[in-house]
Structures are given as C-alpha cells and as structure tokens.
C-alpha cells in the first residue's frame, strides 16, 4: 500500500493531502473518522466525504462540485429495474393482511354475484340478514388470523426473516416499510378489538348463568299459621356463627384474675383482711355478640381498678429528735495569729467586719491576688456520721495540722464555737474565691509549658515536684534566667560565673544535635524513633560532662522551654535594654537557633508542630481533663473534646 501511495504522490496529476484519521474505541466496538480541519468525528465514510466537500472545499480545492458519491447511490443505477419490479409487487401486495382481506372480499363478492345471478331479486329483509352474516364471517376470519399469528412465536422462535412473495431478491423501499408499519398497527388494533369482544361475550354468559340471591328484606306472605312439626330439619341457608363466650372475648381477663389471686395471697400474708375480691360465680345470661363485647370491656376496666386499689403503700415512720446530752469541749490553745477567742457579745461585730472585708477584697488589684491560693487544709470537712458535726482543720508553718471538733445541736448554739480568721486571711480567701479571671490566667500560663511532667500517676508527679522544681533543673544546666529573670540579685558573682560556665557546656553539647533543634527545617523530617535516640544520647552526654542526673523527660522540658523563650523574644519585639544581663548573655549563646521549633512530649515519643495539638496531647496523659479557658474538669477525653468543639470553637 505504501508503494502504491508513493507512485500516486510521485505523479503530477494526483495530489494527496491528509484530511483525517481512523479512531477505534475498544470499549464500545466503534470506528469513527476524525477530521483534522474542524476536529469532529464521523461514524460513516459518506458523511465524512460530504463534510469535506461542503465545509473544507476551499482548503482542498475540489475541481468538481459533485465528485463524492455513496455506495448506495452508485448501485442505484444498476438495480433500477429491480426496484421498479419491487414497487409494482409492493403495490399489488402491500402486506399479508391486506392481501388476505382483499382475497376474502373478492371471493365473497364472486359468490354473491353468482347467487344473485342464479336466484331472483332478493327482499330487503334477506339482504339485511345476509349483510349481518357477512360481517360475522369477516370478524371470525380476522380473529382466526390473529390467533394463528400470535401462537406461532410461542411454538417456535423465528430465526429467519419473514419470506414474502416476489420480494425475496429485492431490498425494501420506503413504501414497503410504510406498509409494514400500517400492517403492524392494524394488527394491534384488531387484537384490542378482539379482546373487547371476548370480554363482552364472557360478561354476557356470566350474567345469564348467575342466580340472583334473595333479597334480605323481602318477606313472604304467610296466610296460615306455621306448624313446627312440618318444618324439615335441614336448612339450605348459611348457618349463623356461634356467639363467642365471655372467656373467649376477654383475653386479658384470665391474666387479671391470676394477678388478683397473687395480690390476695400477698395481702393475706401481711394480715390485710379488707381486700376487695372479684365475684365471678354469678351465672351470666346469654347475650348478643355486641353486648358481650361491651360487657367484657367493662369487666376488664373494673378488674384493673380493683387491682390498683389493692396495692399497699409503704409509709416511712419519722420519730422526733430527742437530745439526751450536750457536751461542751474545752477550748484548744492555739497561736493568736491564726485564731482569736470570740465572746457571744462580739460575734455580730466581727461578722459585720468580715462582710466589709469581703466587699473590699473584690476591689483589690490583680497583682496582689496572684500570691494567694486556697488551701484544702483550711476548709471545713463535714463528718459522715451526723449532719450536726463537722471538723475544722487549720494548718500553719509553726504547728502541725490542728483539728478542732465542734458539736452543736442547733444554729444558735453553734455560733458560740465559730472561729473567724483575721482580716488578712479573709481578704485572701475572698479574693481567691471570687476572681475567676485570675484562675484562668493561672491555668493558661501553667498549661503553656509546664515544668512538671504530666504523668498518669499523681503520686510520682507530686514526689517529683517535691524533690526537684523547674528552676533547679534549669540551674543544673546553667539556664535559670529563662524562667526567673531577677535571679541575678540573689546570687553571688562566683555563682553567676559557675552558672554561665554550665550554660556554655550545655550549649556546646546541644549544638551538635541539629536534628532536634532544627527539626522543622530538615527535609524530609526525621522519624520519631531516630529523634528519641538522639535525645537519649543528649541526656547521656549531658549527665556525663556536667555531672548531673537528669532524665529524658527533663531534657525534653528544657528543650521546649528554650525554644518557647527564644520564640517569644523574637516575635514580641522585646528591647534588649529591658532584659537582664544574664538573659542577654544566654540569648547570644542561642543565636544559632531558628525561630520555628517543635514541641517534644515528655511522656512519649510524639512530636508536635502546633501548640493546640501539643496541649491536647498533654491533657490526654493526665488523669482528669481540664479546660484551659473555663476551668471545667472532665472524666473522659471524648467529653473534653466535645466541650472544646461546642463551647470554644
């Protein structure tokens, strides 16, 4: 084929130009032609050629107007005679139904003409009867033909097209297709007519065969008295349904009677002789079905009422309180700074002073209120045995915990033993109890980066707080200026020099582990297992060189505090003049740190970039879940997260 195209292109009389490509879709099993000029698809070759001639003749420079023909048009000249023969045959027999009808009509017309020719002229009555007979014959012929044609597909499947007389070789034309559609629609209509006729015939037969039942309201005229002996025993009428008994109607009655018997037995055990009983032994008259149904419902209601009345209510017995003895304990000797003895005459004056102090405490500045905390040891604890007894626990630095027991019988007697704190203590208590904003600030500051470990066991956590504080951990590394700025005033110059030497040693070691302090800038970021190994190596080296005993959690806390402090200084634009000398010195040491950093969890190997996620993770390690904004405590993590979504989102 390529050689043939080369020969054509080599000759000067033939010019070839690429107009399209063949496109094949394997999913749909379709072939189409793609036009290069307008980027359109055509499923047939003649359409594509006509499209080129009509739309792209200016590009292709066709020499003739009609130089594109379809295969059908080319073959039309050869088969012209065959088409003419087919048309004549189609006009003669357009469809099988029409030909059969014409033949039947011709046969009937010939028979009628023969009869008319043989016989004498007919009367009008005979003509009408004969026309009716002819119509019935036509209808029966049509019905028989349709029945035969409908039964053929059921008996056997047609695998071949239907044969037609004188049209086996010729192809179908438009007129033939029209005749086929006309025949098909006529068959459908005749089948509908046939169904209607059959329905009417069936209805007429059923109407004739039906026996009308006698009317229910009709009465027979009785002229003689009825004799019961002459009435036969058999009756052809439908027997009446038996009247259901009361036991069948009231289904719940049996269960109610059983429940009533159980209640009566239970009442007899408790010696309650006045229990209502049901009287079911009275003989009931025979009732109709409606009356029996209504009586059964009424009996159910009455029985349920008796059952409700039979229940015994439990009453609680209350006895008046009798005071047998009043013991007044001796007053315990306590220091005057904590507790002052109060007489009965001065109680009202001190209560008024306490209320004034509480009102004044609300107007205190926030700086003074931050120093005071409410202690559990100063609160009153009620005794579990009696509601009139309580213990008052007071804790001081000089003396251990002192418990004073106060026993009272009424509110008036208890005023003699009430002891009120001094004015300073009441101010502290009121200011701490009434200022929720201060507590919010405390929680937010504490949760930002806690120096203590958020471990699950509270006992170990408290022991760790008692032994080592955050400032002491930072002192071991030489970085106390991160949290406590005015520490230089309390330290001697020799101590400051030793702290700075420790800081230099720690920073030299810490600078080696760039995968920890430069975690966010390393691409791709290191895996948590590798970073946990690096932190373990860092702690081991720090403990060896600086002669201290720090855990991995302590090193993680120091790293988090250093990164947060460095980030706050650079983001808040703090002047260097306002910072202490020790803080400036440490800031110069940490000049290699980037601004972006990551949070390392103390209890596990997780690493967080966002602060919110880190705080949520810290709370998940604690026993209770506490909100940092509204100071609510939750038992489970799901409740806490739902509260954050609903209240603070």
UniProtKB/Swiss-Prot annotation:
Annotated signal sequence range: none
Impact upon substituting residue 97 to Y: In strain: MW6
Tissues of expression: Expressed at a low level in a variety of tissues, highest expression is in testis.
UniProt-listed InterPro entries: Znf_C2H2_type
CC per GO annotation: autosome; nucleus
Recorded family membership: Belongs to the Teflon family.
GO biological process: male meiosis chromosome segregation; male meiosis chromosome separation; male meiosis I
Entry's Gene Ontology molecular function annotations: zinc ion binding
Location in or out of the cell: Nucleus; Chromosome
This protein's name: Protein teflon
Chain residue ranges for the region called Disordered: 78-126
Biased composition (Low complexity): 88-104
Species name: Drosophila melanogaster
Residue ranges covered by zinc fingers (C2H2-type): 33-56, 599-621, 625-648
UniProt superkingdom: Eukaryota
